[in-house]
Regions:
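N-terminal secretory/targeting leader peptides
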Residues: 21-123, 132, 141-291
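Thiol/selenol-based redox catalytic cores and closely related redox-interacting motifs
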Residues: 137
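Short, low-complexity disordered leader/linker segments with a strong preference
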Residues: 1-35
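Active-site-adjacent segment of FAD-dependent monooxygenases/related oxidoreductases
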Residues: 129
C-alpha cells in the first residue's frame, strides 16, 4: 500500500510542479493545463469534504475558471501523516485535515489539544477568527514550510459507550479508542480510562468484538462510521474541538501572483464560513439519527 501511495504522490507532484514551475511568473495560466491538487483523508460527504470542495469551487469561481483544482478525498494519496508530510515537502500543494496529527510534526499546535479549554463552539470560532491570534498560529505553521489559510471544524468530539456515565468514577477502566496523540491519551488516562490508539477503520470491529468498550469522535463520524449500531450511549463530553485546518505549501504559495494569492485567501475564507454552516446543520441531523 505504501508503494501505491508513493507512486500516486509522485504522479500528482509531477502535475503540480508542471502547473507551478513551467511558467513560474504566472502559475494561474499554467494551471489551465494542469490542475492544482488538494487532498484530505475523509469521504466527500463530510464537513472535511465539504470544506475541500467549496474551496475548489470558490477558487474556480473567483478566477473565472482560469484556475482549476483537483480534489483527492478519503486518503487516496495517503493518511493524515503522509498528507502533512507531503504538504510540508511540497509534494501536495493544499491539504485539509484535523490539527491533532499535525502536532506530531508541529509540536506547538498541541495548544489545540488542551482538553476542556472551550465548551462553546461559537466562542472557539471567535478566537480562531481573531486576526492577531491567527497570525500567531500561522507563524507556527510557517516555521514548518506550510501556511494556514483557514480553520473550520466538525464541532466537538464526544464519547460513545455501552456503559451509562453519570460521574467521573464511571470512566475508570473504560477501554476507549483515541487518535494517536499523546495529549489525548494523557487526558483519558487522567480520568481513569484506558485509552487505546487505533485506526478508525478498525473501530467498528473493535467495538463489535469487545477489543474496546468506547470511542470518541465528532457526531458526524459516529454516524458515517455507524458507530451508533454498536454503542448505547453518547456522552456529551465536548472534551476537544475537532478542528479542520486548510494548509498550503509555503513555496507554492509564494510563487503565486499577488492576484492569485488574493483569490486563494478569499476562497479559503468563503469555504471556511460555508463548511461551518454545514457543520451546524449536520450536528442536529446526526443527533436525530443517533436518537
Amino acid at each position: 500500500m505504501k508503494k501505491i501511495v508513493s507512486v500516486l504522490i509522485s504522479m500528482i507532484t509531477a502535475f503540480s510542479l508542471t502547473a507551478c514551475v513551467a511558467k513560474e511568473d504566472d502559475p494561474a495560466k499554467a494551471s489551465q493545463s494542469f490542475p492544482w491538487i488538494i487532498a484530505n483523508d475523509s469521504p466527500p460527504d463530510t464537513v472535511t469534504g465539504i470544506f475541500t470542495n467549496k474551496f475548489v469551487e470558490e477558487v474556480e469561481r473567483l478566477s473565472n475558471g482560469q484556475i482549476q483544482i483537483k480534489a483527492y478525498h478519503n486518503g487516496t494519496v495517503g493518511g493524515d501523516r503522509e498528507l502533512v508530510e507531503s504538504c510540508m515537502n511540497g509534494d501536495i500543494p493544499f491539504v485539509v485535515q484535523n490539527t491533532a496529527p499535525q502536532a506530531n510534526f508541529i509540536p506547538k499546535l498541541a495548544i489545540f489539544d488542551l482538553p476542556m479549554a472551550y465548551t462553546n463552539i461559537e466562542d472557539l470560532r471567535s478566537t480562531l477568527d481573531d486576526e492577531e491570534f491567527m497570525s500567531l498560529i500561522n507563524q507556527v505553521y510557517l516555521e514548518h514550510s506550510v501556511r494556514l489559510l483557514a480553520m473550520s471544524d466538525q464541532n466537538f468530539r464526544v464519547m460513545t459507550t455501552n456503559k451509562k456515565i453519570e460521574s467521573l468514577d464511571d470512566f475508570k477502566g473504560q477501554k476507549i479508542r483515541t487518535m494517536e496523540n499523546k495529549y489525548h491519551l494523557a487526558f483519558w488516562q487522567s480520568i481513569g480510562a484506558n485509552p487505546t490508539p487505533m485506526a478508525f477503520s478498525e473501530v467498528y470491529i473493535g467495538l463489535q468484538q469487545g477489543t474496546i468498550d468506547a470511542q470518541e469522535n465528532p457526531y458526524e463520524v459516529i454516524v458515517s462510521g455507524k458507530i451508533y449500531e454498536q454503542q448505547d450511549y453518547v456522552v456529551k463530553t465536548n472534551h476537544l474541538p475537532h478542528l479542520l485546518s486548510m494548509i498550503v505549501n509555503e513555496d507554492f504559495y509564494n510563487r503565486l501572483s499577488t492576484k492569485d494569492k488574493k483569490i486563494v485567501d478569499q476562497a479559503a475564507k468563503n469555504a471556511r464560513d460555508y463548511s461551518r454552516e454545514q457543520c451546524d446543520k449536520r450536528v442536529s441531523d446526526r443527533l436525530s439519527i443517533i436518537k
